[in-house]
Amino acid sequence: MSNKPSLSYKDAGVDIDAGDALVQRIKSVAKATSRPEVVGGLGGFGALCRIPTGYTSPLLVSGTDGVGTKLKLALQLNRHDTIGIDLVAMCVNDLLVCGAEPLFFLDYYATGKLDVDVAATVVTGIGEGCKLSNCALIGGETAEMPGMYQDDDYDLAGFCVGVVEEAEVITGENVAEGDVLIALASSGAHSNGYSLVRKVIEVSGVDVTSSNEQLDGQSIQDALMAPTRIYVKAIKALQDTLGSSALHAMSHITGGGLTDNLPRVLPETLAASIDTNSWQFSELFTWLQNQGNIEQSEMYRTFNCGVGFVIVVPKDKAEAAIQTLNDAGEKAWKLGEMVKREADAVVYR
């Protein structure tokens, strides 16, 4: 027998027992999100899920995303309870764009040293996001990787699968001149532009960990960490009321803002004419713009600026759509209209 010390995985920085403890902590979180289509529970090599009944020719829709450097702010403020909601929102809102119903969700959590309490808090937030989306949390991966990350740092990725009837896929091809753009209010900066947010905080000299500054009736910490709004239930209400055929296009306003996200779903011959007087920047976006001396065009191309989601409908359906969305708990308004494109795909007026 060698005189060398016997090494274990824990000596290398990987605590299997901590990983097992986390799985036990989050089993109830996953169970609370279950849908009838889910087969089995956590812990298998693969998660099983049936396609919901009622579909004639179902298409599966997939998406993956993260929450960017909002994680750095979460670590700085030691606030991990809502970042999981952000993760789910970024994925499920993307799926909504083609008219899909979110079905199941998986997460990836990577860290330098696994803190079971922090990880459980994050996953609890993921579970909350899944409940808000009627989406089952059916699996995930926790990776403890010493040397890849600083001990307390962690990164997140989410993966979501949804389902949509093939004949009801929303592609944007039916968008026509005169169609109305309807905005759904965001809850804040959502999960995009946080590298610029953090730069603004740096140049402003504000200590966000202790500042008593108020924005939009809440602390600056709450304003910056407000979870991304999930639009699943509102869009479902709209589909049930108007029918998918009346929804000519939808866009999730993420990185790139209105400027870059609207063109992704619009015909090349048309432009979105945005009425900038139809809403006002919240105190959060005004604060960011003033503290960072950010140009208006840069604001529109970096942040959602208060518009988290956009729906394009025929003019004669706009009033009913806005009413339905407001009744579903959203703040909706007419953002603009579709016009012939002359140059830019998005025109601010």
Curated annotation (Swiss-Prot):
The keyword tRNA-binding does not apply. It is an enzyme of class 6 (ligase). GO terms for biological process: 'de novo' IMP biosynthetic process; adenine biosynthetic process. GO terms for cellular component: cytosol. CDD domains: PurM (cd02196). It holds the Pfam family AIRS_C. It catalyses: 2-formamido-N(1)-(5-O-phospho-beta-D-ribosyl)acetamidine + ATP = 5-amino-1-(5-phospho-beta-D-ribosyl)imidazole + ADP + phosphate + H(+). Its EC number is 6.3.3.1. Its main location: cytoplasm. Keywords: ATP-binding, Cytoplasm, Ligase, Nucleotide-binding, Purine biosynthesis. Gene3D superfamilies: PurM-like C-terminal domain (3.90.650.10), PurM-like, N-terminal domain (3.30.1330.10). It is found in: Cytoplasm. Pathway: Purine metabolism; IMP biosynthesis via de novo pathway; 5-amino-1-(5-phospho-D-ribosyl)imidazole from N(2)-formyl-N(1)-(5-phospho-D-ribosyl)glycinamide: step 2/2. GO terms for molecular function: ATP binding; phosphoribosylamine-glycine ligase activity; phosphoribosylformylglycinamidine cyclo-ligase activity. InterPro entries: PurM-like_C_dom (IPR010918), PurM-like_C_sf (IPR036676), PurM-like_N (IPR016188), PurM-like_N_sf (IPR036921), PurM_cligase (IPR004733). It comes from the Bacteria. Belongs to the AIR synthase family. This is Phosphoribosylformylglycinamidine cyclo-ligase. It comes from Psychrobacter cryohalolentis (strain ATCC BAA-1226 / DSM 17306 / VKM B-2378 / K5). The lineage of its organism: Bacteria, Pseudomonadati, Pseudomonadota, Gammaproteobacteria, Moraxellales.
